[in-house]
Amino acid sequence: VAGLAAGMLLVSPQPASAANLVTNPGFETDGTDGMPYCWEKSGWGDNDFTFSTVADSHSGSKAMKVTLTRRVDGDRKALITESATCAPVVTAGKQYDLGLWYKSTTPDTAITLFRHDTTAGWQYWTDLKTLDMAAGWTQASVRTPAVPAGTDRITWGVSVYGTGSATTDDYTMEQVSDPIPPATCTATADECANGRWDVLPTQNPVRSMHSVVLNNGKVLLIAGSGNSEENFDAGTFTSAVYDPVKGTYKVIPTPKDMFCSGHVQLADGRVLVMSGNKAFPVAGGHGYEGYKDSYIFDPVTETYSKTNDLNDGHWYPSATELGNGDVISFGGLREDSTGSVTAERWSAAQQQWLPLWQVNQTWSYWGLYPSMILMQDGRLFYSGSHVFGNGTPGTGSAIYDYDANTVTAIPGLQDKDERDQSASVLLPPAQDQKVLTIGGGNIDSNPEANRLTDIIDLKAANPAYTVGPQIPQGTVDLGNGKVAETGNQGKMYVSAVLLPDGKVLETGGGLHNRANPVFEASMFDPATSTFDPVAADPEARGYHSSAFLLPDGRVMATGDNPGNGTWNHNVSIYTPPYLLKGTRPTITSVIDNEWVYGDTQRITVDRPIVKAELI
């Protein structure tokens, strides 16, 4: 399933047991006696008839045609086979929605049902609906009565009881969901409305500025030197793996200073880490330097292994996974402290960084940590979120087309030179292709961080940012305790977290560069383009902080590295309101663990649900 960089896909609301119970619903699989698999000829009376599989289908390559050329009495119908293999299992007392596509040259047709009584066997149940004549493909749907007691299976199809023909295809049968129980608050009224933050009793043992939720449910926390020159000089580089279920940390060996590297989760769950800190600045000499090394972290062995080198150094690079599993990386500082203009591409097929001559280059300087979002058509959207840059070519926003090797400027981003340390997120559902950019400041002039948000529709013919709602204000610590924000005071260092209810939690931040933490959190609803203030993290979360969704639906926040060089090792956990409204549905089965884009997948849960999200 795609990671956060790929956004969130909305699954159309379906009942908890919404799965097509009809086997071979489009007649594509052949059976015996000239009939498709799991379908049989049925009927009675004095009439002349034919059953045929025809190419004139609604979808696929086949449809079923039943024709009566003479009739005195009786009917003919293609029914789901009355067998334990083919007849759908039903539950007494439940109702089922039946659907099909049809064409008909006769008004004498009906959807007919039979049921299997556990004592008496198969018997006629009811005719549910007469189908109107239709020259073109027409959809018909009907809901069954409650299944009678003692019934364990049903079968059904279209009866033809007059001269003419009925051609049918694409049958569906889904159990009607039970009524959704009303939400029941399981905490205080305020917590049920705004959620709750808890500070964990155990601290994060490393100074991690990078966080990755792994495919096994654990969290990789990468520190490297943790922005500590003392650790760097001593060669002390660390990472930790946090287990949210056990509440434990495991510190693991880390081969290089991955402080301010780039990273991305690969399709198989491993984590690709690129570049990092080769050297701290020297007074009167060089600045930060980025190295060319790259590593892969394996969640199974919890170890790093080296890949081939990048073509250039990249301290503070971006990393975006493409649709084919390749990774493209831009920006950051080179080994000589200058800005890198080299694009890098990781080949999923070759499991290596490609040599320079195999990578398209525009020789653009994208700044540091440029926020690159994969678009549905394969291009990349640079949102304008970045760090450490005033008026550099990497400010503003643009669309980058790797295949065409072009960069197209995108207008509309407010105060583009004051979006340092802002956040950008592909809003749910991802297929809507809208991006929200939140807050920011400027490391050079260091003004008060702003409350600005901007929204862009990347599916528009000529995409451009439009003004979004302002970030709600909270409290700020200006050095003498928390006071209410005033005027246009906003925040930089914002974290934006996609939630499974389709909303986005924005949390954390600071009013100035590495100073004055802001205590505010709110939910952004993409459906209404509004913010709703919620409970705020009691811990400072500024520079080198992160917040992310845990597999159980809670949000974890960690880190803060103010200008005095200290580190906040406290970890906060946010419980959103949706976890405080009654018993949670549980996924009981998933057919396939690996999904292809466009697949139809079946997930079973233990209680009625309204919708599901892929994150």
Where are these regions (language model features)?
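Compositionally biased, intrinsically disordered low-complexity segments
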Residues: 4, 25, 150, 593-594
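Extracellular and organelle-lumenal recognition/adhesion modules and their flexible linkers in secreted
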Residues: 18-186
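Short, functionally important structural connectors and interaction interfaces within domains
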Residues: 2-3, 158, 302
